[in-house]
Curated annotation (Swiss-Prot):
This is Elongation factor G. Keywords: Cytoplasm, Elongation factor, GTP-binding, Nucleotide-binding, Protein biosynthesis. It comes from Aeromonas salmonicida (strain A449). InterPro entries: EFG_II, EFG_III, EFG_III/V, EFG_IV, EFG_V, EFG_V-like, EFTu-like_2, G_TR_CS. The keyword Protein biosynthesis applies. Pfam families: EFG_C (PF00679), EFG_III (PF14492), EFG_IV (PF03764), GTP_EFTU (PF00009), GTP_EFTU_D2 (PF03144). GO terms for molecular function: GTP binding; GTPase activity; guanosine tetraphosphate binding; translation elongation factor activity. HAMAP family: EF_G_EF_2_B. CDD domains: EF-G, EFG_III, EFG_mtEFG1_IV, EFG_mtEFG_C, EFG_mtEFG_II.
Length: 701
């Protein structure tokens, strides 16, 4: 079967935003205008097409990143049909992992901002992730019809808060209840969308006289930004020549693709104005798969570099970026094809697990409706049914040309709770449910506490774990009791200790055991986790026993000698030891290494680390003193304050241990008028009194 849409006319985009910027409504309008859904689903009546889990409809927030395919030929049918794959990304900070995952497989993004709230904390997190994956992006300032809407303040925020270079493509005509439409600064025409057909038809009109001067100034800035794309254009511009509409668009596109500028559009998705022009901007300025650099990977040896270009003619390579459980067909594996073609029925290699997988049925999703297709080609996104052993981040590829595409990195959870099934019948179902949920979500972990025998679940925040427990109840019919949230403390060392010895010798009769190591232990910079350096000279320990030493240390890192928490940012250098021809074994060296670790660790000034959260509170000015006082009592470090849309914004770093129950406390202190958002910032040394209390509590257990 030949390709129906040339790859140059594909756009793989994410629509990303802060929790209440109106992203789901924006996506709904996209689906409506592209002719996919004929009735616009409103979020506030719980009927939106993209929010397809029951809980999302109840809470009015998007949790699962659903992928949808739509076609767009332009507001005035000026383009050939373009295929737009939309990945809907959640805006709540506890689901940052979903955003991270989708950024990995996107080519471009639309950042939706609220015209009233401007750039909010979660927007910064998403921005950092887009920077990390070098995703070109445009902005859509939504909710222009709301009281307090201010388009140019939002443009300013992109510069000051996100350190981006915003270039407005449009100027708004009126705002709040007088929001009428926008001025297209490239065409220098006003766009007026018809209210009779929900904004499907529109007219170009002359720019209102009172806005003409401002529009001309903004157009000059736009043309200047375009001229900076090349020396030729700059010469033409400085020489006083007019740039053509085509030259301007081509130049702006180039600068967006190079991540040099952010083009800004505006509108009100709810009032059916502006989304249409934003879709035109997606086609005009965001990349096709062929505009993006080839994807890097490694051969199966894990060392030799390899790459794949966006072409049907290269060997098949795809990345599984999401696993979802579907009530009708079981596991759905969402994947992005980077190169080649795959047909239903084909066998492929999961190169990360080195296992064969067979593509049974392949479907393309429109929110929660699905269409079966026979093949998927380079640049496309689809979901496979029935893959056996695939997790998020695995590579699926041609068996004859294996490649491992770069793996995604997932953050460590910062909060854990114990869960217990309510009845014996729930016991077995709970294990299955948690296993399935952990497969879907790599930022969620499950394990059994060896001392208490309890099942522990861990995640990125209280809301994250609430939703996991809620999904167990709804989707798997498992009732569970939930314990008190626990903070995920860590341990590390602050000093270097040299020549620490560990000797394991049992040599009385028969075959004995003998292992002897001498190591140095030293602190690593934050985020380096662990390193093992083998500095053995002259074969004093044979090569086959070295992995045993590494394993012995790694096992000790799981539970540090200080308080039994995982150890991070620690390095070990093995530089001397001895062995016995008959009695030595890998196991003996593993035991010797763990003995050395235990004896050296407590001499290396071990410290307890606690997770610190970045907290941002938006509060009316009258309550500012109370909010700051409360954050100080919670051991918070106030980083700064600024004016927000409805009062003041306070930014602080606060230990997670002090943030439990904060939502309730903030509500009562401000009569429900303040709101807050928080995300993990870093681990740092817990003060002595806190560390002592935690260590005592651990020992008493």
């Amino acid at each position: 079967m030949a390709r129906t849409t040339p790859i140059e006319r594909y756009r793989n985009i994410g629509i990303s935003a802060h929790i209440d910027a109106g992203k789901t409504t924006t996506t709904e309008r996209v689906l409506f205008y592209t002719g996919v859904s004929h009735k616009i689903g409103e979020v506030h009546d719980g009927a939106a097409t993209m929010d397809w889990m029951e809980q999302e409809q109840e809470r009015g927030i998007t949790i699962t990143s659903a992928a949808t395919t739509a076609f767009w030929s332009g507001m005035g049918k000026q383009f050939q049909p373009h295929r737009i794959n939309i990945i809907d990304t959640p805006g709540h900070v506890d689901f940052t992992i979903e955003v991270e995952r989708s950024m990995r497989v996107l080519d471009g993004a639309v950042m939706v901002y609220c015209a009233v709230g401007g750039v909010q904390p979660q927007s910064e997190t998403v921005w950092r992730q887009a920077n990390k994956y070098k995703v070109p992006r445009i902005a859509f300032v939504n909710k222009m019809d709301r009281t307090g809407a201010n388009y140019l303040r939002c443009v300013e925020h992109i510069k000051t808060r996100l350190k981006g270079t915003p270039v407005p493509l449009q100027l708004n005509i009126g705002s709040e209840e007088n929001f009428k439409g926008v001025i297209d600064l490239v065409k220098m025409k006003a766009i007026n969308w018809s209210e009779a057909d929900q904004g499907v038809s529109f007219d170009y009109e002359e720019i209102p006289a009172e806005l003409l001067e401002q529009a001309q100034e903004m157009r000059m800035s736009l043309v200047e930004a375009a001229a900076e794309a090349s020396e030729d254009l700059m010469e033409k511009y400085l020489g006083g020549e007019e740039l053509t509409e085509e030259e301007i668009k081509k130049a702006l596109r180039l600068r967006v693709l190079n991540n040099e500028i952010i083009l800004v559009t505006c509108g009100s998705a709810f009032k059916n104005k502006g989304v249409q022009a934003m879709l035109d901007a997606v086609v005009d300025y965001l990349p096709a798969p062929t505009d993006v650099a080839a994807i890097d990977g490694l051969k199966l040896d894990g060392v030799t570099k390899d790459e794949r270009h966006a072409s049907d003619d290269e060997p098949f390579a795809a990345l599984a970026f999401k696993i979802a459980t579907d009530p009708f067909v079981g596991n759905l594996t969402f994947f992005r094809v980077y190169s080649g073609v795959v047909n239903s029925g084909d066998s492929v290699l999961n190169s990360v697990k080195e296992k064969r997988e067979r593509f049974g049925r392949i479907v393309q999703m429109h929110a929660n409706k699905r269409e079966e297709i026979k093949e998927v080609r380079a640049g496309d996104i689809a979901a496979a049914i029935g893959l056996k052993d695939v997790t998020t981040g695995d590579t699926l590829c041609d068996e004859k040309s294996p490649i491992i595409l770069e793996r995604m990195e997932f953050p460590e959870p910062v909060i854990s709770i114990a869960v217990e099934p309510k009845t014996k019948a729930d016991q077995e179902k709970m294990g299955l449910a948690l296993g399935r949920l952990a497969q879907e979500d790599p930022s969620f972990r499950v394990w059994t506490d060896e001392e208490s025998g309890q099942t522990i679940i861990a995640g990125m925040g209280e809301l994250h774990l609430d939703i996991i427990v809620d999904r167990m109840r709804r989707e798997f019919k498992v009732e569970a009791n939930v314990g008190k949230p626990q903070v995920a403390y860590r341990e590390t060392i602050r000093e270097t200790v040299k020549d620490v010895e560990g000797k394991h010798a049992k040599q009385s009769g028969g075959r004995g055991q003998y292992g002897h190591v001498v190591i140095d232990m030293y602190p690593l910079e934050a985020g380096k986790a662990y390193e093992f350096v083998n500095d053995i000279k002259g074969g004093v320990i044979p090569g086959e026993y070295i992995p045993g030493v590494d394993k012995g240390i790694r096992e000790q890192l799981k539970s540090g000698p200080l308080a039994g928490y995982p150890v991070m940012d620690l390095g070990v250098r093995l530089h001397f030891g001895s062995y016995h021809d008959v009695d030595s074994s890998e196991l003996a060296f593993k035991i010797a290494a763990s003995m050395a670790f235990k004896s050296g660790y407590m001499k290396a000034n071990p410290v307890l680390l606690e997770p610190i959260m970045k907290v941002e509170v938006e509060t009316p000015e009258d309550y500012m003193g109370d909010v700051i006082g409360d954050l100080n009592r919670r051991r918070g470090l106030i980083e700064g304050m600024e004016d927000g849309p409805s009062g003041k914004i306070v930014r602080a770093l606060v230990p997670l241990a002090e943030m439990f129950g904060y939502a309730t406390a903030l509500r009562s202190a401000t009569q429900g008028r303040a709101s807050y958002a928080m995300e993990f910032a870093k681990y740092s040394d817990a003060p002595n009194n806190v560390a002592q209390a935690v260590i005592e509590e651990r020992k008493s257990k």
